[in-house]
Structure formats: structure tokens, C-alpha cells
Curated annotation (Swiss-Prot):
GO terms for biological process: translation. This is Small ribosomal subunit protein uS7c. InterPro entries: Ribosomal_uS7 (IPR000235), Ribosomal_uS7_bac/org-type (IPR005717), Ribosomal_uS7_CS (IPR020606), Ribosomal_uS7_dom (IPR023798), Ribosomal_uS7_dom_sf (IPR036823). One of the primary rRNA binding proteins, it binds directly to 16S rRNA where it nucleates assembly of the head domain of the 30S subunit. PROSITE patterns: RIBOSOMAL_S7 (PS00052). NCBIfam families: rpsG_bact. One of its GO terms (cellular component) is small ribosomal subunit. It comes from Lathraea clandestina (Purple toothwort). Belongs to the universal ribosomal protein uS7 family. It is found in: Plastid. Pfam families: Ribosomal_S7. It comes from the Eukaryota.
Length: 155
């Protein structure tokens, strides 16, 4: 038995301008080579573009986009007796949000154009409306889980 105490769960920090954890999660995922200032700059420019496009609060658009892309269920590869099955598993809220952010950023990076802030804002607006690559990815994941429902007892 371990003599060490249990580790305290880290509280997610919030960003300086919007004071929001989701924005901070987004910043930490967009971060490359430790350039956090640049990551913040990209996010805030994207938020400004969302404000101009939709004329609504960019935080509500971000929340709506992430809520729309967050999956409820995903598949996990599980090896059973020589063959690998895709086993559907339920996803917790934090993990779901992390996946949603990852998919939104991947879809943004795939978009044509040079400016990441513009691509991210476009993807967030599309996701909030219920279209876009990230939404397609979520639907694809749900379809995979539905198709492999027979293997749910392998959990």
C-alpha cells in the first residue's frame, strides 16, 4: 500500500480576458513550441472575428460549438482472443470537451487559408450552426459506436 497521499485534482485555470476555462483549454491545445503569447493572440483574434461575423457574444458561440462537437460515446480498440474489436465506451464531460477542442482545431488547420485566427473563427461559427468538419467527425464517431454496439459487453 502506498504511503503517499492521494494527489489533489488540479483546478483548470482561466484566461486573463474572458476568465473562462474553455478558452484556456483551447489556448493550451493550440500552443506550439511553448509560444503561449502567440496562442492567446490567435484565440483573441478569432474571438474578435466571431464577434464581427455573428454580432453575438463570442463566448456563447464557443460554448455552443464545443457543446455541438462533444461526443457522448466513442470506440476503443480492445484485443479479445486474437482479434481486435472496436468497443464503444461512454465518455466523461472533461474528456469529451478535450476531444471536441482537438477536433475543432484539427478541422481549423485543414481549412484553406493562411490566417489561423480566421480559420478557427470560421470553424467555430460553423460548428455552432451544426455544420463543419468537426461536427462530421463527431457524427462519424457516433456511427462507429452504433455499428459496433454488439461488442459493448467487452468493456
Amino acid at each position: 500500500m502506498s504511503r503517499r497521499g492521494t494527489a489533489e485534482e488540479k483546478t483548470a485555470k482561466s484566461d486573463p480576458i474572458y476568465r473562462n476555462r474553455l478558452v484556456n483549454m483551447l489556448v493550451n491545445r493550440i500552443l506550439k513550441h511553448g509560444k503561449k503569447a502567440l496562442a492567446y493572440q490567435i484565440i483573441y483574434r478569432a474571438m474578435k472575428k466571431i464577434q464581427q461575423k455573428t454580432e453575438t457574444n463570442p463566448l456563447s458561440v464557443l460554448r455552443q460549438a464545443i457543446r455541438g462537437v462533444t461526443p457522448d460515446i466513442a470506440v476503443k480498440a480492445r484485443r479479445v482472443g486474437g482479434s481486435t474489436h472496436q468497443v464503444p465506451i461512454e465518455i466523461g464531460s472533461t474528456q469529451g470537451k478535450a476531444l471536441a477542442i482537438r477536433w475543432l482545431l484539427a478541422a481549423s488547420r485543414k481549412r484553406p487559408g493562411r490566417d489561423m485566427a480566421f480559420k478557427l473563427s470560421s470553424e467555430l461559427v460553423d460548428a455552432a450552426k451544426g455544420s463543419g468538419d468537426a461536427i462530421r467527425k463527431k457524427e462519424e464517431t457516433h456511427k462507429m459506436a452504433e455499428a459496433n454496439r454488439a461488442f459493448a459487453h467487452f468493456r
